[in-house]
Regions:
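Short alpha-helical donor nucleotide-sugar binding micro-motif in glycosyltransferases
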Residues: 77, 149, 259-260, 267-269
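Membrane-proximal helix-turn-helix segments that form the acceptor-binding/catalytic region
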Residues: 70-78, 127-155
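N-terminal strand-loop element at the rim of the active site
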Residues: 7-14, 20-64
Length: 269
């Protein structure tokens, strides 16, 4: 089988899709022809993978980038049997008007809500956003979301909440719930005088890292506990979190250590 995967991020970028897509691609490429199209901070002449990686530079004119991505999907999708959409959903929809290929789409949230919420253009939570009416521009984005989603042949979600979300949008195709997996490691008993916490996450508003910091600040003040929190990741909330850490007087307790990969990340566990 010939498979094309589209994603918004891929190593060396850090984030959920950048972890999931290579794992899936590594497995599928053993028995199938496979290519990946991704946005990237930089383009690389050589990628150390057993399948094709086609990178489009993220930081460029958005209209030009969109058109370039659509054309690349059309070019690389002509001979594929199926397109797995882990990102670039609107670009795939436009390209597939010409390609007419079967598609499987992974839904892990509402991309329209996430974008608006991350940019502080709305304050409503996920479920409120589905019920309320907004400006014409936002309603148009929701319409495009719904229309493109319903064009998929199969949708995969990691939770019942998201399954209900997809059903409520009127999707009539094949819908599968596959819960997120995790790496099982050997547990070790330790006796420590202090509490150590770890957050591994993209630094975006919807992750609610600010609530964790405020909660730990209250616990520290009430119970006088000593703790250390390492936050691994990068993203647009970095400066806001730095300011909050200073405001809550947690400079000695909380460290933003940036993005870490593989062995570097294991060190924090």
């Amino acid at each position: 089988m010939n498979i094309l995967i589209t994603t918004g991020i891929f190593p060396p970028d850090v984030g959920g899709p950048a972890k999931f897509v290579p794992l899936m691609a590594d497995s599928l490429s053993k028995n199938h022809v496979l290519n990946v199209i991704t946005l990237s901070e930089e383009t690389y002449s050589v990628d150390e993978f057993e399948y094709g990686i086609f990178r489009i530079k993220r930081n460029q004119n958005k209209i030009f980038r969109f058109l370039k991505t659509v054309m690349l999907i059309i070019r690389k999708g002509r001979n594929v049997n199926i397109i797995f959409i882990n990102g670039l959903w609107l670009e795939v929809y436009i390209a597939n008007l010409f390609l007419r290929k079967k598609t499987i789409r992974k839904i892990v949230g509402d991309p329209v809500w996430e974008k608006l919420y991350t940019q502080y253009k709305i304050d409503d939570n996920f479920d409120q956003f589905q019920q309320k009416k907004y400006t014409l521009k936002i309603e148009l984005l929701k319409f495009l979301r719904n229309f493109t989603l319903k064009s998929s042949n199969t949708i995969v979600v990691p939770s019942k909440h998201l399954m209900d979300f997809v059903k409520n949008l009127g999707f009539k195709g094949s819908l599968l719930q596959i819960n997120n997996g995790t790496e099982i490691t050997e547990s070790k008993k330790t006796n420590k005088d202090s509490y150590e916490f770890l957050i591994v996450s993209r630094l975006v508003r919807q992750k609610n890292i600010d609530i964790v910091l405020k909660s730990l600040s209250l616990v520290k003040e009430k119970y006088s506990i000593d703790f250390q929190l390492n936050i691994v990741g990068e993203g647009p909330e970095y400066k806001n979190l730095i300011g909050l850490i200073e405001q809550l007087n947690l400079i000695e307790n909380v460290k933003l250590v940036g993005a870490k990969h593989s062995e570097e990340l294991h060190h924090f566990y």
